[in-house]
Amino acid sequence: MKEELVVRRISDGTVIDHIPAGRALRVLKLLGITGERDGVVALVMNVPSKKLGKKDIVKIEGRELSKEEVDKISLIAPSATINIIRNFEVASKRRVELPRRVVGILRCLNPNCVTNAPREAVEPSFTLISESPLRMVCEYCGEYLREEDIIEQLSGV
């Protein structure tokens, strides 16, 4: 008997697929989805995947993600795909792409960096230097952020 995963289709919204296993809750937190006031959200974790071995999937009804939200997701789930659903059909499907530059989303770990000075109005800016493993560098002081640092900052863990 073939086993199937049954999750209700959404009429309009976003499906985030190919999230690395165990990171779906972080994606929800990143998007500010608590489940208390939001529409229908389906969360499936540790689903078998040919590409990843295991993966997570998030379905969000009634919401299309902004570019900034997709950029944030790419930093914690670089293998994810974003499917926009309209009238029960996939209107568009694309893989997330790591942004080459990130401004105002991450903070520098160097306490002496100008971006951490309370009297300076300087937004932290980072440049992508490696996709695998994920590493970014502060444009002001040269401090490196590793994938673990980025995930921790974006998910508040």
From Swiss-Prot:
<comment type="subunit">
    <text>Contains catalytic and regulatory chains.</text>
</comment>
<protein>
    <recommendedName>
        <fullName>Aspartate carbamoyltransferase regulatory chain</fullName>
    </recommendedName>
</protein>
<feature type="binding site">
    <location>
        <position position="141"/>
    </location>
    <ligand>
        <name>Zn(2+)</name>
    </ligand>
</feature>
<keyword id="KW-0862">Zinc</keyword>
<dbReference type="InterPro" id="IPR036793">
    <property type="entry name" value="Asp_carbatrfase_reg_N_sf"/>
</dbReference>
<dbReference type="Pfam" id="PF01948">
    <property type="entry name" value="PyrI"/>
</dbReference>
<comment type="similarity">
    <text>Belongs to the PyrI family.</text>
</comment>
<dbReference type="GO" id="GO:0009347">
    <property type="term" value="C:aspartate carbamoyltransferase complex"/>
</dbReference>
<dbReference type="GO" id="GO:0046872">
    <property type="term" value="F:metal ion binding"/>
</dbReference>
<dbReference type="InterPro" id="IPR020545">
    <property type="entry name" value="Asp_carbamoyltransf_reg_N"/>
</dbReference>
<dbReference type="InterPro" id="IPR002801">
    <property type="entry name" value="Asp_carbamoylTrfase_reg"/>
</dbReference>
<feature type="binding site">
    <location>
        <position position="138"/>
    </location>
    <ligand>
        <name>Zn(2+)</name>
    </ligand>
</feature>
<dbReference type="GO" id="GO:0006221">
    <property type="term" value="P:pyrimidine nucleotide biosynthetic process"/>
</dbReference>
<keyword id="KW-0479">Metal-binding</keyword>
<dbReference type="InterPro" id="IPR036792">
    <property type="entry name" value="Asp_carbatrfase_reg_C_sf"/>
</dbReference>
<dbReference type="GO" id="GO:0006207">
    <property type="term" value="P:'de novo' pyrimidine nucleobase biosynthetic process"/>
</dbReference>
<keyword id="KW-0665">Pyrimidine biosynthesis</keyword>
<feature type="binding site">
    <location>
        <position position="108"/>
    </location>
    <ligand>
        <name>Zn(2+)</name>
    </ligand>
</feature>
<dbReference type="InterPro" id="IPR020542">
    <property type="entry name" value="Asp_carbamoyltrfase_reg_C"/>
</dbReference>
<dbReference type="Pfam" id="PF02748">
    <property type="entry name" value="PyrI_C"/>
</dbReference>
<comment type="function">
    <text>Involved in allosteric regulation of aspartate carbamoyltransferase.</text>
</comment>
<feature type="binding site">
    <location>
        <position position="113"/>
    </location>
    <ligand>
        <name>Zn(2+)</name>
    </ligand>
</feature>
